[in-house]
């Protein structure tokens, strides 16, 4: 359902917005240009965020990362458990819809956690998202109802650290 309906809707939204944007530009319809640029950003953000998220999940996932990523997490957060607590707090503390993210800051050469709001892919400049969890209600409501904390706790059992 999540992949075949929600993610597919974002892809369709990208295609529709691109077509409408081309038409609006050809007609010099500035209001439609701005509207469709906004719609394109939203749907493209939804597509990009979900594409990263699918790679972050595996039925064989869980446990902890190893190697360079494990060392970077320990360096940035003090331990994997402290990182997991901070990332989970970002996810559970998100007001409304969005994503919790572990990103690599290419400017500061460090890992950090942050929240993304909605789907606008408003990732700070220089940040490469490494791990994301979808905190839109459609991601957890069917199975976890309104108990976001249970969803976030279960997320750690399917994190694909190999990717």
Swiss-Prot record:
One GO molecular function term of this record is: metal ion binding
**Obligatory cofactor(s):** Mn(2+)
Keyword Calcium in record: no
Keywords in alphabetical order:
Manganese, Metal-binding, Oxidoreductase
Q: What is its EC number?
A: 1.15.1.1
Please share the entry's free-text remark on the cofactor.
Binds 1 Mn(2+) ion per subunit.
Q: Does the keyword Oxidoreductase apply?
A: yes
Catalytic reactions on record: 2 superoxide + 2 H(+) = H2O2 + O2
User: Per its UniProt entry, what is the enzyme's top EC class, as one word?
Assistant: oxidoreductase
Q: Where does Mn(2+) bind?
A: 2, 50, 134, 138
- Function as written in the Swiss-Prot or TrEMBL entry: Destroys superoxide anion radicals which are normally produced within the cells and which are toxic to biological systems.
Question: What's this protein's name?
Answer: Superoxide dismutase [Mn]
Please name the source species.
Answer: Mycobacterium scrofulaceum
């Amino acid at each position: 359902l999540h992949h075949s309906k929600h993610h597919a809707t974002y892809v369709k939204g990208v295609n529709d917005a691109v077509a409408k944007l081309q038409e609006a530009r050809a007609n010099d319809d500035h209001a439609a240009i701005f509207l469709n640029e906004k719609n394109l950003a939203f749907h493209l953000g939804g597509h990009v965020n979900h594409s990263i998220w699918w790679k972050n999940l595996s039925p064989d996932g869980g446990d902890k990362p190893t190697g360079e990523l494990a060392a970077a997490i320990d360096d940035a957060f003090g331990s994997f458990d402290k990182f997991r607590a901070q990332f989970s707090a970002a996810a559970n503390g998100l007001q409304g819809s969005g994503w919790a993210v572990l990103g690599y800051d290419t400017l500061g050469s460090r890992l950090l956690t942050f929240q993304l709001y909605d789907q606008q892919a408003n990732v700070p400049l220089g940040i490469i998202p490494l791990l994301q969890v979808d905190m839109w209600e459609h991601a957890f409501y069917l199975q976890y109802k309104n108990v976001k904390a249970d969803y976030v706790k279960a997320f750690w059992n399917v994190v694909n650290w190999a990717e």
